Amino acid sequence: MDDRPPPHPEPSASDSDSDSSSENPLASISPSEIRVAIFCALPIESVAVRYTLDEEYQCRPPRHHPQSKYVFTYGRIGEHKVVLARPHQIGPVKAALCAAAVSGLFPTVRFALMVGIGAGIPGKRDIRLGDLAVGVPRENHPGVVEYDLGKYEKDGFVLKGALNKPHPVLVSADGALEEEEIMGRRPLRRVLRELMRRPGYGRPDLADVLYDPGFHHVNKGEDCRACDVADDSKVVARPVRAGKRGYPVVHRGLILSGRGVIKNPEDLDRLRRGQDDAICFEMEAAGIVDEIPCLVIRGICDYADTHKQDGWHRYAAAVAAAYCKAVLCKIDGPEELEDPVKQRTGDAFGEDLRLDADWCRRPHLE
């Protein structure tokens, strides 16, 4: 399966305007009403997020602004008006340019979420395809680190430099969702079920196989059918998961972000050595988190190896989009800012956002 969007392509801004004006015009909002930015790198990711919007809007940011070359989607999730942005290309540099554009065009944006697919890092944690990786800060890391800035030493890979942490209210909302999980509830159930009805976004009927790191993909450029006939010694044995089959498990920890795609098992082993909390590789977050406080959410679509797992891409994107909505619906809508400059000063804007105590009574997320 390729990375093209579903059969109904994502409409351009001009298409949306023409269709909506003749049939069902979109309501208009001001750029100053937008408080949340959502970033996606691939069309399949942004389409998954659009499917979770409770409402779409029209919005006209200043055309004279030097960063107005991007086309955005505007909508509402829960009580939050959001701008959905997609860089022109993948990678941290393009992501940073897009984040800077969002900051310039929408100065009232308080925080962001990076939503999409990523490569799981199997090891001490039982990470499976279709699971979730969330970059949550710990005492020894901010939730996301840029592995391009580190260096290899004899004891493993040593990370250098530091990136900003996600906004505290996003971390608190994630913690509230973790409490729901511990209590045996499934906060993603309804949203994910609705997403899985969309063309191409259902859970694939494919085996989730973790191959031995030393076993390279057979027949480059093709799927893993030739790999599947290998003897059992090439496959990592894993127990059947308890609980509801197929429901994603959320893994919280360190996300490694960089410019290159990790496929070499030796590089993977060196990077994760000494980084016990590392759960996922991805390529854009490092360009965003220093521009806007950002929570990184990735659906696991492969294991950072040479084996092709393209059939999991859209489902992994759907899982990430569902979790993004769950996080935002945990947070009350922000009050109007008296001084927009305060939003860039860390804790200054934490006072305007409160966790929603009525989470369990939200019917659309039961």
What are these regions (language model features)?
Residues 2-352:
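Intrinsic-disorder/coil detector with helix-boundary
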Residues 353-366:
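Walker A/P-loop-proximal flanking segment of P-loop NTPase domains
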